C-alpha cells in the first residue's frame, strides 16, 4: 500500500509496538512501555497505528502527538502478519482518504463495526446487545453508485488534478480508477479526465459529481464562473457519446441546469423488485450509495416491524419514500403510512414516487424534525409501528415525542452509532426494550457504521 508522512507530523521517531486491539476507526492500538527503546516518560501512553492489526509486532513512525495519546503509521511488520490481513484491492489505498479498511478481511471489518456499535450502546445508553441480526453484506465489490470527485487546476504547473482527497488532508490524489466505485463509472474516469483537461475554463471547475440509477448515469459539473460555449459543447458531446445526463451547477441547488441533448426525463431511477417498486430521483437527491445493501435493508426493516394488513405506520426522515413505499405495500390498502421529511422538494419527490407506483395508502408531510411536531394533525393519527432513519446528528430533539406515540415496534436505522446509542437511551427511559440490532455493510472498506435496531414497547405491569 502507498503511505506518506502526515503533514501534521511533529516527529520522525520510529518505534516498535505490539498491537493489542482495534480502535473504533479500525486502527491498531498499542501502548508505550513494552520495548526497551520506549522512553520512560511515555510508558503507558496509548498509540494508534494506521494499518496495523492486533497481534502484529510492527515498526511505526509517530506522526502526531498529544498529551494523552500518539498517532503513527505502519512502516513494517516484524513477524507474521495477522490472519485478518489481506492485500488491498486498490492501488490508491493508503493515500486516498476514501477507504480505511481494505487491508482487513471482510469478516473482521464486520466484527469491528459490531464492537463499535455494542460499545456505544453500552457507554451512552447502558444497553447490552442480547441478539445480533445476521450482518447485511454488500453483494458487490464495486458498490458505490455515486461519487464526488475533486478537480483542481495548478496554473504554475499547467496541470489538472482529478481525484479524491488524501487521508487527513485537503490535497487531491490523482485517481485513474476506484475499486469501490461502480465499474461503469470507474472505467470512465480516465476519459473524463481527458475531457476536462481539454476545457478552456478548466480552472473554473471545482468538482464533478457522478450518480447512477439502475440504467442511467448523470454527470454534474460544479463551476465557479460561467463556462464558455465551446466548453459546454465539449461536455455535451461527451455526455451524448456516453448516453449520460449532463448537469451544470454554478451555485446552490436552484442553479442546477440540465444541458445535454437527449431531451429525456430529468430523473434517474432504481427498482426494488421485492416490493414491485420503482423510484425516481434527481442527481442532488439523497439516495443510498450501495444498491444491494439498500435492497436487503428495506426487506429487513419490514420483516422486523412484522407489519399486518390494516396497520398504521409512521416513517420519519422519509426522504423520497425509500422506506415509506415498501411499508405501504406491507400494510395493504386497508393500512396507512405517513412519511415526514424536512425537505419540501423531497416530499414532492415522495408523492411522485407513490403516484408512479399507484400507491394510495401513503401520505407525506414536510416538517422540521428538530422541533416539536406533536400539535400537527398527522402526528395524532395513532401508529402501530414507527420507522426512523435520521441523519448523522440523530433525532435527540424529538425522541420523547417519538416515545409518546407508544408504537408497539420501532425500527431505527442509523449511520452514526453514537447518536443511535444516545437516542436509544431515551427510548429505554420511555419503556422500550432493545430487542435486536445489526450492522449493515453499506460502506465496505470504511470505518462508517450503518446499523439497524428493533425496539419493542414493554407491557407495563401494575403492582
From Swiss-Prot:
GO molecular function: 4 iron, 4 sulfur cluster binding; iron ion binding; RNA binding; rRNA (uridine-C5-)-methyltransferase activity
Entry keyword Ligase: no
GO annotation, biological process: rRNA base methylation
Residues that bind [4Fe-4S] cluster: 90, 96, 99, 178
EC numbers, comma separated: 2.1.1.190
PROSITE patterns: SAM_MT_RNA_M5U, TRAM, TRMA_1
InterPro entries xrefs: 23S_rRNA_MeTrfase_RlmD, MeTrfase_TrmA_AS, NA-bd_OB-fold, SAM-dependent_MTases_sf, TRAM_dom, U5_MeTrfase_fam
Residues at the active site: 415 (nucleophile)
Catalyzed reaction equations: uridine(1939) in 23S rRNA + S-adenosyl-L-methionine = 5-methyluridine(1939) in 23S rRNA + S-adenosyl-L-homocysteine + H(+)
Residues the record lists as binding S-adenosyl-L-methionine: 288, 317, 322, 341, 368, 389
UniProt cross-references to Pfam families, sorted A to Z: TRAM, tRNA_U5-meth_tr
Similarity comment text for this entry: Belongs to the class I-like SAM-binding methyltransferase superfamily. RNA M5U methyltransferase family. RlmD subfamily.
Annotated NCBIfam families: PRK13168.1 (NF009639), rumA (TIGR00479)
Protein name: 23S rRNA (uracil(1939)-C(5))-methyltransferase RlmD
Organism taxonomic ancestry: Bacteria, Pseudomonadati, Pseudomonadota, Gammaproteobacteria, Moraxellales
Amino acid at each position: 500500500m502507498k503511505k506518506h508522512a502526515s503533514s501534521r507530523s511533529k516527529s520522525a521517531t520510529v518505534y516498535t509496538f505490539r498491537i493489542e486491539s482495534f480502535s473504533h476507526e479500525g486502527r491498531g492500538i498499542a501502548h508505550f512501555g513494552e520495548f526497551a527503546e520506549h522512553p520512560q516518560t511515555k510508558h503507558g501512553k496509548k498509540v494508534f497505528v494506521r494499518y496495523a492489526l492486533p497481534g502484529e509486532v510492527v515498526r511505526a513512525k509517530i506522526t502526531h502527538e498529544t498529551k494523552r495519546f500518539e498517532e503513527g503509521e505502519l512502516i513494517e511488520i516484524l513477524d507474521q502478519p495477522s490472519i485478518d490481513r489481506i492485500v488491498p484491492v486498490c492501488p490508491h489505498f493508503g493515500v486516498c482518504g476514501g477507504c480505511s479498511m481494505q487491508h482487513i478481511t471482510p469478516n473482521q471489518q464486520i466484527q469491528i463495526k459490531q464492537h463499535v456499535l455494542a460499545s456505544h450502546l453500552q457507554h451512552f445508553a447502558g444497553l447490552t446487545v442480547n441478539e445480533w441480526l445476521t450482518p447485511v453484506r454488500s453483494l458487490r465489490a464495486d458498490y458505490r453508485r455515486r461519487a464526488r470527485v475533486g478537480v483542481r487546476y495548478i496554473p504554475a504547473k499547467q496541470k489538472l488534478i482529478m481525484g479524491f482527497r488524501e487521508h487527513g488532508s485537503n490535497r487531491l490524489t490523482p485517481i485513474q480508477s476506484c475499486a469501490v466505485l461502480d465499474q461503469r463509472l470507474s472505467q470512465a474516469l480516465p476519459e473524463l479526465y481527458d475531457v476536462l483537461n481539454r476545457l478552456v475554463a478548466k480552472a473554473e471547475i471545482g468538482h464533478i459529481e457522478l450518480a447512477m440509477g439502475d440504467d442511467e448515469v448523470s454527470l454534474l459539473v460544479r463551476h465557479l464562473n460561467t463556462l464558455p460555449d465551446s466548453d459546454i459543447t465539449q461536455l455535451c458531446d461527451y455526455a451524448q457519446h456516453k448516453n449520460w445526463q449532463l448537469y451544470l451547477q454554478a451555485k446552490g441547488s436552484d442553479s442546477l441546469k440540465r444541458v445535454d441533448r437527449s431531451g429525456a426525463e430529468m430523473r434517474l431511477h432504481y427498482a426494488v423488485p421485492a416490493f414491485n417498486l420503482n423510484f425516481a430521483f434527481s442527481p442532488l437527491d439523497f439516495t443510498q450509495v450501495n444498491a444491494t445493501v439498500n435492497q436487503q435493508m428495506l426487506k429487513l426493516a419490514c420483516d422486523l416491524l412484522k407489519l399486518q394488513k390494516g396497520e398504521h405506520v409512521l416513517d420519519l426522515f422519509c426522504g423520497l419514500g425509500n422506506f415509506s413505499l415498501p411499508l405501504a405495500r406491507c400494510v395493504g390498502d386497508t393500512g396507512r403510512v405517513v412519511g415526514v421529511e424536512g425537505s419540501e422538494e423531497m416530499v414532492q419527490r415522495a408523492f411522485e414516487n407513490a403516484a408512479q407506483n399507484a400507491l394510495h395508502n401513503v401520505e407525506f408531510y414536510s416538517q422540521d424534525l428538530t422541533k416539536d411536531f406533536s400539535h400537527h394533525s398527522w402526528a395524532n393519527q395513532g401508529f402501530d409501528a414507527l420507522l426512523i432513519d435520521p441523519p448523522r446528528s440523530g433525532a435527540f430533539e424529538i425522541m420523547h415525542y417519538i416515545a409518546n406515540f407508544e408504537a408497539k415496534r420501532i425500527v431505527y436505522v442509523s449511520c452514526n452509532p453514537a447518536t443511535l446509542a444516545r437516542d436509544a437511551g431515551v427510548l429505554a427511559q420511555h419503556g422500550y426494550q432493545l430487542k435486536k440490532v445489526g450492522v449493515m455493510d453499506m460502506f465496505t472498506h470504511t470505518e462508517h457504521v450503518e446499523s439497524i435496531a428493533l425496539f419493542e414497547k414493554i407491557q407495563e405491569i401494575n403492582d
